[in-house]
C-alpha cells in the first residue's frame, strides 16, 4: 500500500532570539500617515511632528500674587526699619492692562496673574501692607525691603519663543493638551492609527454570544488582542474567525492584507495537521521572517511579510498569544507612530516567590508587582502555562527568566517588562 510521504518541513524550524525577531520586524515597520485632529480628540494620539513655541510663555510680566506693583528702589529705606507710603494710582484685575506708568512714590493694586504695569519691577504681597485714605486718595504702607523681580514671573520664564514644546512621537496626555491649548494649537498633527485586522483560526471556536458546545470554546483571543492593539495606539478590526482550512485562510489573509496596515491572527501556528497558518507562511509568495522564537510561552510565534505588510501569526494558547502580542505586535504599532520607546519598559525587581521551572528558552512569566519595605517585588502567577487565561488579568509585568537548569529563588534580582497599565501595589 502506497503512503503519502510525510511533509517534515514544518518540523524543521530554526529558532531565533527575541531580540533578533524584533529586529527583523522593525525593518518592515512603516511610519504611519499624518492627519490633523481637533484638540479635544488629541488625547492618546501620537504627534506626527515636533512642535515649537510660537511665542514666549508667559508673554508678559505677570504678578505671582495679590498685592501691589511697585518700584523696588522705593523700599531701600525700609532696611532701616522705616515705613514708606506709596500713592495707589490704579487697580489691575486679572485679564486687564493698566495704561498708567508706575514711577517713584507710586503703587498699583494688582491681582494674581495680571500683567505688571509699565515701570513696576516688583510686587509686594497684600499681607505685608496696610492702607490709609487721605484727601480722597489711597496710600499703601510697607516696612519690608523688596528685591527687583520679587513675586514677578518674567516673560519666557517657562518657555522661550522657538523652544521645543513637544517632540514627534509623543503620546498626548492631559499635560500635553494643556500645553497645546496654551499655545493655541487647536488642530493637532498626529499619526493615523494603524489599522489592524484581527482574526482567529480554529474549527473549535465559538462566537462569544454562542452557547457552549461539547469540544468547543469561545473565541476570547480575538477580543484580547483587540484590546492590546487599542492600548498600543492601533485601531483593531475584528474579522470573522475561520475554520482550519488552508485555502480559506489564504484568501482571508490576502483580503485583510489588501485592506489593513497589519494583520494579526491567533492559532494554527504549530506543527499539527490542522495548523494552517504554519503552512501558509511557507508559501512561495510569502516572505517569512521567522516561525520559531527562543521564548516560552509562544515559541511558535511567527511573522511574515506579504505585499510589504506585516502578518503576525500568534499562538492559539491565550498566555502565549498575549505575550507574543506584547513583544512583537505592540512595538510594531508604536514604531509606526514614531514612539521614542516602542518596547516595554524594563525594571529591576526582587523575585517575590520561588520560581522552580527550568528553561532551555527565555521564559516570560506573567506576574504582579507589589512594594515590600520600599522594594519592588515581582510575584509569579500561580498558573502560568501557555494555555492559562485567567492569570492574564492579574499581570502587571512579565518576569524575564533566562535559560536555567535550577530555577530562581525568592529574593533574587530579576528583570521585568512592565505592561501598560501595570501597577505597583
Describe each model-derived feature in a short phrase:
Residues 1-80, 109, 339-364:
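Short, low-complexity N-terminal leaders and the immediately following helix N-cap/first helix
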Residues 35-40, 44, 49, 95, ...:
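Flexible glycine/proline-rich
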Residues 2-18, 69-240, 378, 382-383, ...:
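Short, glycine/charged-enriched hinge/interface segments at domain edges or termini
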Residues 26-33, 50, 72, 116, ...:
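Structural signal for hydrophobic packing residues in well-ordered secondary-structure cores
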Residues 1-5, 11-18, 186-314, 318-324:
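Helix-rich terminal scaffold detector
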Residues 13-20, 34-37, 41, 65, ...:
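Conserved active-site and cofactor/substrate-binding residues in soluble primary-metabolism enzymes
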Residues 110-112, 126, 167-168, 208, ...:
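Thr-Gly-centered strand-to-loop micro-motif
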Amino acid at each position: 500500500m502506497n503512503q503519502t510521504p510525510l511533509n517534515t518541513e514544518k518540523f524543521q524550524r530554526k529558532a531565533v532570539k527575541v531580540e533578533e525577531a524584533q529586529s527583523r520586524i522593525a525593518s518592515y515597520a512603516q511610519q504611519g500617515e499624518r492627519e490633523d485632529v481637533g484638540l479635544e480628540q488629541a488625547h492618546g494620539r501620537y504627534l506626527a511632528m515636533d512642535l515649537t513655541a510660537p511665542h514666549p510663555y508667559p508673554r508678559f510680566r505677570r504678578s505671582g500674587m495679590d498685592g501691589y506693583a511697585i518700584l523696588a528702589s522705593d523700599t531701600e529705606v525700609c532696611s532701616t526699619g522705616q515705613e514708606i507710603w506709596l500713592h495707589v494710582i490704579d487697580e489691575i484685575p486679572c485679564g486687564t492692562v493698566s495704561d498708567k506708568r508706575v514711577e517713584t512714590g507710586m503703587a498699583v493694586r494688582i491681582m494674581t496673574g495680571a500683567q505688571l504695569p509699565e515701570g513696576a519691577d516688583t510686587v509686594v504681597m497684600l499681607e505685608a501692607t496696610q492702607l490709609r485714605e487721605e484727601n480722597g486718595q489711597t496710600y499703601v504702607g510697607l516696612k519690608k525691603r523688596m528685591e527687583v523681580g520679587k513675586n514677578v514671573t518674567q516673560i519666557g520664564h517657562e518657555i522661550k519663543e522657538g523652544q521645543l514644546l513637544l517632540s514627534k512621537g509623543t503620546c498626548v496626555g492631559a499635560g500635553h493638551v494643556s500645553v497645546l491649548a496654551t499655545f493655541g494649537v487647536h488642530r493637532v498633527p498626529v499619526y493615523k492609527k494603524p489599522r489592524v485586522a484581527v482574526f482567529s483560526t480554529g474549527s473549535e471556536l465559538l462566537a462569544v454570544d454562542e452557547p457552549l458546545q461539547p469540544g468547543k470554546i469561545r473565541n476570547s483571543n480575538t477580543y484580547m488582542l483587540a484590546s492590546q492593539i487599542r492600548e498600543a495606539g492601533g485601531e483593531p478590526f475584528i474579522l470573522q474567525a475561520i475554520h482550519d482550512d488552508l485555502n480559506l485562510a489564504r484568501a482571508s489573509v490576502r483580503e485583510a492584507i489588501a485592506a489593513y496596515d497589519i494583520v494579526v491572527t491567533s492559532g494554527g501556528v504549530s506543527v499539527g495537521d490542522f495548523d494552517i497558518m504554519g503552512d501558509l507562511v511557507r508559501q512561495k509568495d510569502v516572505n517569512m521572517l521567522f516561525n520559531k522564537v527562543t521564548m516560552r510561552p509562544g515559541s511558535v510565534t511567527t511573522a511574515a511579510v506579504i505585499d510589504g505588510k506585516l502578518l503576525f501569526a500568534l499562538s492559539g494558547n491565550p498566555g502565549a498569544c498575549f505575550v507574543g502580542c506584547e513583544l512583537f505586535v505592540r512595538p510594531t504599532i508604536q514604531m509606526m507612530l514614531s514612539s521614542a520607546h516602542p518596547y516595554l519598559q524594563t525594571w529591576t525587581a526582587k523575585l517575590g516567590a520561588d520560581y522552580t521551572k527550568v528553561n532551555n528558552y527565555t521564559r516570560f512569566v506573567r506576574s504582579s508587582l507589589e512594594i515590600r519595605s520600599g522594594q519592588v517585588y515581582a510575584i509569579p502567577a500561580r498558573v502560568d502555562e501557555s494555555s492559562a487565561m485567567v492569570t492574564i488579568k492579574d499581570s502587571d509585568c512579565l518576569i524575564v527568566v533566562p535559560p536555567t537548569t535550577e530555577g530562581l529563588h525568592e529574593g533574587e534580582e530579576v528583570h521585568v517588562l512592565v505592561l501598560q497599565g501595570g501597577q505597583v501595589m
